[in-house]
A protein has these predicted regions:
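Motif-centric detector for short Cys/His coordination patterns
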Residues: 1-99
Length: 99
């Protein structure tokens, strides 16, 4: 049986746009990935100000929100992976915010 290996090159993030219900990330290969904000509960429950204070990590391999303690990788976005945070962890975080 022959198998072939396909190299999967992960592009870097160029820009991030967040609306009330969508996270959009423009990539260096020309694609734009849009996912439901509900996939990332910390972003969903964050304020507009908190959502807009992001920075690239790993030279564009990911995005970090300091105030929300959230990290999202470009690879995870491309693979369609929502947040892997447990409900218990998220509830603890939400309780620290007084929600």
């Amino acid at each position: 049986m022959n198998t072939s290996v396909t190299e999967f090159v992960i592009p870097d993030a160029l820009s991030v746009t967040i609306t009330d219900d969508t996270l959009c990330v423009d990539l260096t290969d020309g694609r734009t990935i849009s996912v439901p904000l509900a996939w990332y509960p910390r972003l969903f429950h964050g304020t507009v100000e908190e959502r807009n204070k992001w920075r690239f990590i790993g030279k564009g391999h990911g995005i970090h929100w300091d105030a929300l303690d959230e990290d999202i990788s470009v690879e995870g976005l491309l693979l369609g992976k929502p947040s892997g945070e447990s409900q218990a962890s998220f509830k603890r975080w939400l309780n620290t915010r007084g929600n």
